[in-house]
Regions:
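NTP-dependent small-molecule kinase module
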Residues: 2-9, 32-34, 148-215
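Hydrophobic anchor at the beta1->P-loop junction of P-loop NTPases
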Residues: 18
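P-loop (Walker A) phosphate-binding loop of NTP-binding proteins
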Residues: 21
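Conserved lysine of the Walker
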Residues: 26
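ATP-dependent small-molecule kinase phosphotransfer cores
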Residues: 42-121, 125-129
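A glycine- and Lys/Arg-enriched "phosphate-lid" helix/loop adjacent to the NTP-binding pocket
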Residues: 112-175
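Phosphopantetheine-dependent thiolation modules in NRPS/PKS and related acyl-activating systems
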Residues: 211-245, 249, 254, 259-299
């Protein structure tokens, strides 16, 4: 099996996804992750795939409620779900990421591939082509539990205690999820134990990601201090230097500048893609800090 070639998104936010069997603990991990990131000041969007548009459709409900699927071509349902994921990704997830939000998704495109392959459609190429339009998660968690554990958890829900579950399919799905995770740069999490243990593993990976996206306030303070003092740092060559920041770093830099300059930036100055060089920092400082940087030569 080849890897899904998902598209690296251009947003300043984070995309975190959770996939796995029904009963693997996705809902609990999403709840705990959201609470953890909210305490850290993240603006969140919680979502799921496929969306209710598909889940409420007649073909989806009929297929899910029947034990006998002989009269249904699963590929048609998968195509419906895939088109829904494209629409949802382009018009819900990407805009949120570009607004700097952290998006947490219950299931993702990986689930579409896993379900298709688990049902025997292993030669279909169309799903790989569609994947190239789907934003790649910053963290893709695959929660792994033994099939019997997952089924027992599902059966413990009052509303689903009598639900028909195709056990053979669940074993195939688990195998596909594990393989997709390994080939797509996902993070396999053992979710068989208590939720506290599972979340500790999830939180560790989140913290590792956040640590790679440092707060820029210290660097901003040092740079502006040198600029205000008329240091040689203000030479044109220095001002032309690329700050070397990714989109998240630029957003952090803007927020730090607003706080440092005690100013509320105009919307046009909040665009992180306009903040590339030290000279761009100077221009903002001159605009919002009055005479403190008036003698600094901007590029």
């Amino acid at each position: 099996m080849e890897a899904l070639n998902l598209k690296v998104h251009d947003g300043t936010g984070l995309l975190i996804t959770f996939c796995g069997l029904d009963g693997c603990g996705k809902s609990t991990m999403i709840e705990k992750t959201a609470a953890y990131l909210e305490r850290k000041g993240h603006s969140l969007l919680l979502t799921r795939q496929p969306t209710d548009f598909v889940r409420r459709s007649d073909i989806f409900r009929t297929y899910m409620d029947l034990e006998d699927h002989d009269n249904y071509e699963y590929r048609s349902l998968s195509l419906l779900a895939a088109s829904d994921r494209v629409q949802h990704s382009c018009h819900v997830i990407l805009p949120a990421l570009r607004e700097g939000k952290t998006v947490i998704s219950d299931r993702y495109f990986y689930s579409c591939l896993a379900n298709l392959r688990a049902r025997g459609y292993r030669e279909d190429r169309w799903i790989y082509e569609i994947a190239e339009t789907i934003p790649k998660p910053d963290l893709a968690f695959f929660l792994d539990v033994p099939v019997k554990t997952a089924v027992a958890r599902v059966r413990s829900r009052a509303a689903e205690k009598d639900r028909y579950i195709d056990m053979a399919l669940q074993y195939e799905l688990r195998k596909e999820y594990r393989e997709i995770c390994g080939r797509s740069g996902g993070i396999l999490i053992n979710a068989e134990g208590p939720w506290e243990q599972t979340f500790a593993a999830v939180r560790e990976k989140i913290d590792e990601l956040l640590a790679r996206r440092p707060d820029m306030s210290g660097q901003v303070l040092a740079l502006l201090g040198e600029l205000a003092a008329g240091s040689s740092v203000c030479r044109e060559s220095r001002l032309s230097e690329d700050l070397g920041l990714d989109s998240f770093g630029r957003v952090s830099l803007i927020l730090a500048l607003e706080e440092l300059l005690d100013a509320e930036f105009e919307e046009s100055d909040l665009d992180p893609f306009q903040l590339v060089t030290a000279g761009d920092v100077v221009r903002l400082a001159q605009k919002y800090a009055g005479g403190a940087y008036e003698n600094t030569a901007a590029v």
